[in-house]
């Protein structure tokens, strides 16, 4: 059985359940296109946190992820998968984006398994959550657009194979327009 469910619809439409909206992004502090741009318009405080993280850590974020509160909806967390140093036409190569996607999802998996912890001895995923998390991370539904396939130009089927590697550990709802 697949760990990926496809639905048609608008991923930004408010839902009545706890969810983590996952997107791939750059480490340069720019939510300038694709779903990231839509997130920036809708959740400017979350974008401010994202920019702060990027300014502090830069490319050291590659292969990591961070959870940000949306500040608008207490059931919505935003998960940034850091898969490329830069965005736009300066994005990384396809294989490195896929490798960093897998590493970042591994981090998310670790924190989901850690129940209500957002810090381990090696990493922190939720420095910005400060009371904005309602449930243990593992109870949030994981949702995403077809990550990497827009501005980063990675064929969706290749990212889909990375997601399938997490079968049994994480299930994803993928939104299609």
Swiss-Prot record:
<feature type="binding site">
    <location>
        <begin position="24"/>
        <end position="26"/>
    </location>
    <ligand>
        <name>substrate</name>
    </ligand>
</feature>
<dbReference type="GO" id="GO:0042278">
    <property type="term" value="P:purine nucleoside metabolic process"/>
</dbReference>
<feature type="domain" description="Macro">
    <location>
        <begin position="1"/>
        <end position="177"/>
    </location>
</feature>
<feature type="binding site">
    <location>
        <begin position="31"/>
        <end position="36"/>
    </location>
    <ligand>
        <name>substrate</name>
    </ligand>
</feature>
<feature type="binding site">
    <location>
        <begin position="9"/>
        <end position="11"/>
    </location>
    <ligand>
        <name>substrate</name>
    </ligand>
</feature>
<dbReference type="GO" id="GO:0047407">
    <property type="term" value="F:ADP-ribosyl-[dinitrogen reductase] hydrolase activity"/>
</dbReference>
<protein>
    <recommendedName>
        <fullName>ADP-ribose 1''-phosphate phosphatase</fullName>
        <ecNumber>3.1.3.84</ecNumber>
        <ecNumber>3.2.2.-</ecNumber>
    </recommendedName>
</protein>
<dbReference type="GO" id="GO:0006974">
    <property type="term" value="P:DNA damage response"/>
</dbReference>
<dbReference type="InterPro" id="IPR050892">
    <property type="entry name" value="ADP-ribose_metab_enzymes"/>
</dbReference>
<dbReference type="GO" id="GO:0006388">
    <property type="term" value="P:tRNA splicing, via endonucleolytic cleavage and ligation"/>
</dbReference>
<dbReference type="GO" id="GO:0016791">
    <property type="term" value="F:phosphatase activity"/>
</dbReference>
<comment type="similarity">
    <text>Belongs to the POA1 family.</text>
</comment>
<comment type="function">
    <text>Highly specific phosphatase involved in the metabolism of ADP-ribose 1''-phosphate (Appr1p) which is produced as a consequence of tRNA splicing. Removes ADP-ribose from glutamate residues in proteins bearing a single ADP-ribose moiety. Inactive towards proteins bearing poly-ADP-ribose.</text>
</comment>
<dbReference type="GO" id="GO:0005654">
    <property type="term" value="C:nucleoplasm"/>
</dbReference>
<dbReference type="InterPro" id="IPR002589">
    <property type="entry name" value="Macro_dom"/>
</dbReference>
<dbReference type="Pfam" id="PF01661">
    <property type="entry name" value="Macro"/>
</dbReference>
<dbReference type="InterPro" id="IPR043472">
    <property type="entry name" value="Macro_dom-like"/>
</dbReference>
<feature type="binding site">
    <location>
        <begin position="147"/>
        <end position="153"/>
    </location>
    <ligand>
        <name>substrate</name>
    </ligand>
</feature>
<keyword id="KW-0378">Hydrolase</keyword>
